[in-house]
Swiss-Prot record:
Subunit structure: Component of the ClpX-ClpP complex. Forms a hexameric ring that, in the presence of ATP, binds to fourteen ClpP subunits assembled into a disk-like structure with a central cavity, resembling the structure of eukaryotic proteasomes.
Sites where the protein binds ATP: P117, T118, G119, S120, G121, K122, T123, L124
Nucleotide-binding recorded as keyword: yes
Family named by the database record: Belongs to the ClpX chaperone family.
Boundaries of every ClpX-type ZB domain copy: 1-54
GO MF, one example: ATP binding
Role this protein plays: ATP-dependent specificity component of the Clp protease. It directs the protease to specific substrates. Can perform chaperone functions in the absence of ClpP.
Phylogenetic lineage: Bacteria, Bacillati, Bacillota, Bacilli, Bacillales
Protein residues bound to Zn(2+): C13, C16, C35, C38
InterPro entries (UniProt xref): AAA+_ATPase, ATP-dep_Clp_protease_ClpX, ATPase_AAA_core, Clp_ATPase_C, Clp_protease_ATP-bd_su_ClpX, ClpX_bact, P-loop_NTPase, Znf_CppX_C4
Gene3D superfamilies reported in the protein's UniProt record: 1.10.8.60, ClpX chaperone, C4-type zinc finger domain, P-loop containing nucleotide triphosphate hydrolases
Name of the protein in its database record: ATP-dependent Clp protease ATP-binding subunit ClpX
Domain of life per record: Bacteria
GO biological process terms on file: cell division; proteolysis involved in protein catabolic process
Length: 423
């Protein structure tokens, strides 16, 4: 097993064959030896390979219009939000790749705030971005966070979710995206600082500051404080992109008051402000509005890009039902297709479903529960029936709970509750 020089009986390198007299150091392994020269050569080869991968990664960043185009496949509407997100994400990863070179100008990080009503697509936009860029992605809920030392989740647990999403590859996690949902719930109760401790509001904002800006954080691999002796994972958040989203209920009133102050007086165009629809005020949001809402100035400063999403109208919800690659109608059609049944939704049925979602104020998120209620009896009965080959969902199915129209192979109409008896 051991490599000896036949003449002198000396140990020699198992790779290059040089004896221990010909090299500075010989490292022993189980039955093999490697010299310092071979170690240096192997290190250079590995570094060259890693350098090649990094160059490929730089070339693979999609352009903003390409990112926006892919977002269009999954998210309906919200054009301005898509544009601002595409540019921000492109610049963020361009900045990361430029940091490997020695540059005179240092580019700062641009975290993003998404403001929009529930079900408008905030989370879906962030998820789709992570899928496009093929980077680790984690979703955190701000409502469960508390200041360190209090019952609840520490802010470091957000980073643990990202590390887990990267399969504990810290280097990969350091280039990931974190979406913090319900960020409006950590707003302090009033615009003015309070003398009482606000551990789940302003305290959380203070705790998030360094992570948002970029710091080396110590993350407990098992989470929480139950294992005080565990070794901590060190992660640098300088290149982690943070997207904070929330409904910010009540901020429209703050924006209205600010706009109202500017139009008081003679010769002002009051009608111009009155033309704005309820959801359109969000597009006028400024950092000062977030300050009045209850976010602290330091927190707002670390989220420089503010993008608003408008409430979805009936037409947009109908498009969401039918157009995206993972549209709900396509999903249910596929489910029934597996039972050899063709599913059809009439135009009036789609509009009634959309109107019901608007009435419930659940946005796109509420569409599935509405369709599930309509389709329950259909999906219960159809698998056991051999006579029905087509199912038509019409408007009355949504508004009056009427049964859908079933058709046989020869075009005969069937009833859902009374299966046709076979001869």
């Amino acid at each position: 097993m051991f490599k000896f020089n036949e003449e002198k009986g000396q140990l020699k390198c198992s790779f290059c064959g040089k004896t221990q007299d010909q090299v500075r150091k010989l490292v022993a392994g189980p039955g093999v030896y490697i010299c310092d020269e071979c170690i240096e050569l192997c290190t250079e080869i590995v570094e060259e390979e890693l350098g090649t991968d990094e160059e490929v990664e730089i070339e693979e960043i999609p352009k903003p219009n390409e990112i926006c185009s892919i977002l269009d496949d999954y998210v309906i509407g919200q054009r301005e939000a898509k544009k601002s997100l595409s540019v921000a994400v492109y610049n963020h990863y361009k900045r990361i790749n430029s940091m490997s070179r020695s540059e005179d100008v240092e580019l700062s990080k641009s975290n993003i705030t998404l403001i929009g009503p529930t079900g408008s697509g905030k989370t879906l936009l962030a998820q789709t971005l992570a899928r496009i860029l093929n980077v680790p992605f984690a979703i955190a809920d701000a409502t469960s966070l508390t200041e360190a030392g209090y019952v609840g989740e520490d802010v470091e647990n957000i980073l643990l979710k990202l590390i887990q999403a990267a399969d504990y590859d810290v280097e990969k996690a350091e280039k990931g995206i974190i979406y913090i949902d319900e960020i409006d719930k950590v707003a302090r109760k009033s615009e003015n600082p309070s003398i009482t401790r606000d551990v789940s509001g302003e305290g959380v904002q203070q705790a998030l500051l360094k992570i948002l800006e970029g710091t080396t954080a110590s993350v407990p691999p098992q989470g929480g404080r139950k294992h005080p002796h565990q070794e901590f994972i060190q992660i640098d958040t300088t290149n982690v992109l943070f997207i904070c989203g929330g409904a910010f209920d009540g901020i429209e009133q703050i924006i209205k008051r600010r706009l109202g102050k500017k139009v008081i007086g003679f010769g002002t165009d009051d009608a111009k402000q009155d033309d704005l629809k309820p959801g359109e005020y969000l597009s006028k949001v400024l950092p000062e509005d977030l300050l009045r809402f209850g976010l602290i100035p330091e927190f707002i400063g670390r989220l420089p890009i503010i993008s608003s999403l408008s409430p979805l109208d009936t037409d947009a919800l109908v498009e969401i039902l039918t157009k995206p690659k993972n549209a709900l109608v396509k999903q249910y059609q596929k489910l029934l297709e597996l039972d050899d049944v063709e599913l059809e939704f009439t135009e009036d049925a789609l509009r009634e479903i959309a109107n019901k979602a608007i009435e419930r104020k659940t946005g796109a998120r509420g569409l599935r529960s509405i369709i599930e209620g309509i389709m329950l009896d259909v999906m219960f009965d159809l698998p056991s029936r051999e006579d029905a080959v087509k199912c038509i969902i019409h408007g009355a199915c949504v508004t009056d709970d009427a049964p859908p129209i079933l058709k046989s192979a020869d075009g005969t109409e069937l009833t859902l509750d009374k299966p046709k008896e076979s001869a």
